[in-house]
Amino acid sequence: QSGNPFSGRTLLVNSDYSSKLDQTRQAFLSRGDQTNAAKVKYVQEKVGTFYWISNIFLLRDIDVAIQNARAAKARGENPIVGLVLYNLPDRDCSAGESSGELKLSQNGLNRYKNEYVNPFAQKLKAASDVQFAVILEPDAIGNMVTGTSAFCRNARGPQQEAIGYAISQLQASHIHLYLDVANGGWLGWADKLEPTAQEVATILQKAGNNAKIRGFSSNVSNYNPYSTSNPPPYTSGSPSPDESRYATNIANAMRQRGLPTQFIIDQSRVALSGARSEWGQWCNVNPAGFGQPFTTNTNNPNVDAIVWVKPGGESDGQCGMGGAPAAGMWFDAYAQMLTQNAHDEIAR
């Protein structure tokens, strides 16, 4: 897996997300707001976003993504499909807004391997004509490093085994793996860098057989800027006040262990200045805007690409901005706000 897998490719548009944004575009059109309606249309047609395979039922969306990628290739495009592998048993053990369908106490580890990872891997291996970037288990390593509850501590060993298994099953030249390492606000502190590298080393050891990953993902579903010259006060004392610096710091910790050093960084949603009073605020942060769309021009040799992972407009949970629905449900008022505050590259 040498070379940047995103180089010369475009991140595939997520057709499911695009159709959800129809409601947002109509809301702007009904108010005669052509400017923001045009921005939504740009996101729908031009901005690639990862597909979330967050339970066993949603494995079918891999087939949709593969179909869409083949259609794009037939039109002369050169797509890479972004997928999020996210169904760890006892996942989100610390926050609980996104707990999943599998429980370690109910045969969750075996079910994860046999009913989720195996079919996931089979679908990707069968589509050897398509390039895939797969983010593995957002937030899991964050919880392993900092999760102090008995629930998180008990989940740690089996979860390491589970992620190692997923890595071992997804070894193929057209599959590029990025193990999630939370974000700079969570693991970017000086005393967290080394434990994070240790956790990664343990997981790769469990993957066995010289299993390879391309690197790491960060800021998935979070709101940190890619780079800033004016970091908010709550970052004071951290060597990782933005995600580019976080990537550099983690890369240095990984390099010392002979581990991979490349990153992809989610910029689907970025908090506006003053939106957060503390770094730990992660839920429907208000105000925020759509961030930098997909690019490989990252100004950081450790960053393969800036990507959109979280579909902006899907709620983080019943928290943050008023009126928020349950995690994953569509929150149109939020999508409208993201559009109004969108990055300059999104059509004006």
UniProtKB/Swiss-Prot annotation:
It catalyses: Endohydrolysis of (1->4)-beta-D-glucosidic linkages in cellulose, lichenin and cereal beta-D-glucans. GO terms for molecular function: cellulase activity. Its EC number is 3.2.1.4. Substrate binds at W52, S54, N183, W186, N222, W282, K310, E314. Residues 222-241 have a biased composition (Low complexity). It comes from the Eukaryota. The active site is at D92 (proton donor), D139 (proton donor). The keyword Hydrolase applies. It holds the Pfam family Glyco_hydro_6. GO terms for biological process: cellulose catabolic process. Residues 222-244 are annotated as: Disordered. Keywords: Carbohydrate metabolism, Cellulose degradation, Glycosidase, Hydrolase, Polysaccharide degradation. The keyword Magnesium does not apply. Belongs to the glycosyl hydrolase 6 (cellulase B) family. Monomer. Plays a central role in the recycling of plant biomass. The biological conversion of cellulose to glucose generally requires three types of hydrolytic enzymes: (1) Endoglucanases which cut internal beta-1,4-glucosidic bonds; (2) Exocellobiohydrolases that cut the disaccharide cellobiose from the non-reducing end of the cellulose polymer chain; (3) Beta-1,4-glucosidases which hydrolyze the cellobiose and other short cello-oligosaccharides to glucose. This is Endoglucanase-6B. It comes from Humicola insolens (Soft-rot fungus). The gene is cel6B.
